[in-house]
From Swiss-Prot:
Solcar repeats lie at residues 8-92, 121-205, 223-307. It comes from Aspergillus fumigatus (strain ATCC MYA-4609 / CBS 101355 / FGSC A1100 / Af293). Coiled coil: none annotated. One of its GO terms (biological process) is glycine import into mitochondrion. This is Mitochondrial glycine transporter. The chain crosses the membrane at residues 14-39, 67-93, 127-152, 180-203, 227-253, 282-300. One of its GO terms (molecular function) is glycine transmembrane transporter activity. It catalyses: glycine(in) = glycine(out). It is found in: Mitochondrion inner membrane. HAMAP family: SLC25A38 (MF_03064). It is a multi-pass membrane protein. GO terms for cellular component: mitochondrial inner membrane; mitochondrion. InterPro entries: Hem25/SLC25A38, Mitochondrial_sb/sol_carrier, Mt_carrier_dom_sf. Belongs to the mitochondrial carrier (TC 2.A.29) family. SLC25A38 subfamily.
Length: 320
């Protein structure tokens, strides 16, 4: 019975993560495509000319959503794996005596003066679980990420994802499907860790403000959703600004692995050829996309989990 319950909850976290990831990736694909194009080369690609080029093409709408399938697969299943592993890590860490002792001063259990149904951890716990979960999910989804970047870019003339994958394996071997993983991990681990840290801190502070305004009454569902959305957007903006250089390097490595080789060589070449500015290429687009996608994904995920937790609690009462 316990195993069945845990399995169903794990499955639901996977489904909730998948749903939230698909929603954000499909809606915000144009911003992701523009970011990839802008990061190709700081000298030849800037935002306005890139937009004009796409809009002047025979199929502008299709052009803006080019690469939606690999992006949706990557973000959808990546989010599913990330949220599932993040929940497992947070649940496990929250149950240890050391974590409980560290988090005791800020933990309030499942109180609805919080906007979240997720376990409360210390700052280091939030940082570590976010980084580990994102790195693991990123490794599993790396081949899809490489396909997405190559397909979105105008460096290649791939007509389908199959032809892209076949060409990469033929010319670069299976290793080519993991191009840029070092830079991706260097970007995603600190980004995810910082994001979860900022997100939880912002939620806690905003929830305290909202609960005081509601005279100690439980938070309304609309208040919880608003708190999660605002916290997600702000946390993503902060974490994105800090880690953008890794994203710019990752894009170059995935587009031209033969030229750039590794992270250190890529950084040197980018600065030599395009200046320090190249490390911050696409920052505005990435902040916009990350803020919106994270706000949407985490709000949808948290809302689904809150509703599921309420139903599971009611079911447990009935079973008793």
């Amino acid at each position: 019975m316990l195993y069945s319950c845990l399995a169903s909850k794990t499955t639901f976290h996977f489904a909730a993560g998948l749903c939230s990831g698909l929603t954000s990736s499909i809606l915000l694909q144009p911003a992701d495509l523009l970011k990839t194009r802008v990061q190709q080369s700081q000298k030849t690609a800037s935002l306005l000319p890139t937009i004009k080029t796409i809009l002047s093409s025979p199929h502008p709408i299709r052009g803006l959503w080019r690469g939606t399938l690999p992006s949706a697969l990557r973000t959808g299943f990546g989010s599913a794996l990330y949220f599932t592993s993040l929940n497992a890590l947070r649940q496990g860490l929250a149950q240890t005596e050391a974590a409980m002792a560290i988090a005791a001063s800020s933990s309030d259990g499942k109180s609805r003066t919080s906007s979240s149904a997720l376990p409360k951890l210390s700052n280091w716990g939030n940082l570590a679980t976010g980084a580990v979960a994102r790195t693991a999910a990123g490794f599993v989804m790396m081949p899809v990420t490489v396909l997405k970047v190559r397909y979105e870019s105008d460096y290649y003339a791939y007509r389908s994802l199959y032809s892209a994958g076949r060409d990469i394996v033929r010319t670069e071997g299976v290793r080519g499907l993991f191009s840029g993983f070092g830079a991706t991990a260097a970007r995603d681990a600190p980004y995810a860790g910082l994001y979860v840290l900022f997100y939880e801190q912002l939620k806690r502070r905003l929830a305290l403000v909202a609960s005081s305004e509601q005279s100690e009454q439980p938070l309304k569902s609309t208040s919880s959703s608003s708190i999660n959305f605002v916290s997600g957007g702000l946390a993503a903006g902060l974490a994105t600004a800090i880690t953008n250089p890794f994203d710019a390097v990752k894009t170059r490595l995935q587009l031209m692995p033969g030229k750039y080789g590794n992270m250190i060589r890529a950084v040197r070449l980018m600065i030599r050829e395009d200046g320090v500015r190249s490390l911050f290429g696409g920052l505005g687009l990435r902040i916009t996309r990350k803020a919106l996608s994270s706000a949407l994904a985490w709000t949808v995920y948290e809302e689904l989990i809150l509703r599921a937790e309420a139903r599971w609690a009611e079911k447990d009462k009935i079973d008793l």
